[in-house]
Amino acid sequence: MNIALVAHDKKKDDLIVLIKTYAHILKKHQLFATGTTGKRIAEATGLPVHCFRSGPLGGDQEIGAAVARGEMDMIIFFRDPLTAQPHEPDVSALMRLCDVYSIPLSTNMGGSEILIRSIEQGDFESLKLSHNDEPPA
């Protein structure tokens, strides 16, 4: 699976805790992330992470484009709901694309743990078959 990992500044440490905890599962998948988040994850875990640009510099949009092309299977995005983000429209657009293309999206630790454990159980096999270039009708 192709999994995108994104975290706002105040949530990066939480995301790293999650990735360390589930590294034994995530190492079997291709990990993608926005710039700083990806670098921090790679440094903290040793896992290979393909880094897009930083979120405010277009990284969220790059991940969104990958979603639209059917190249992402899951998004874990630890958002900071208490801090205004200058690129909030990009964040909203990414979340919208996840809804349009039925891509699992989690924005917090609890939901992310459920998604990652579901990967381990093979619960997303049918999802791979449903991806295509056209949004559902």
UniProtKB/Swiss-Prot annotation:
Substrate binds at H8, K12, T34, G35, T36, T37, S54, G55, H87. GO terms for biological process: methylglyoxal biosynthetic process. PROSITE patterns: METHYLGLYOXAL_SYNTH, MGS. Keywords: Lyase. Residues 1-137 form the MGS-like domain. Coiled coil: none annotated. It comes from the Bacteria. It is an enzyme of class 4 (lyase). The active site is at D60 (proton donor/acceptor). Its EC number is 4.2.3.3. The keyword Lyase applies. It catalyses: dihydroxyacetone phosphate = methylglyoxal + phosphate. GO terms for cellular component: cytosol. It holds the Pfam family MGS. The keyword Lyase applies. GO terms for molecular function: methylglyoxal synthase activity. Gene3D superfamilies: Methylglyoxal synthase-like domain. Belongs to the methylglyoxal synthase family. Catalyzes the formation of methylglyoxal from dihydroxyacetone phosphate. This is Methylglyoxal synthase. The lineage of its organism: Bacteria, Bacillati, Bacillota, Bacilli, Bacillales. The gene is mgsA.
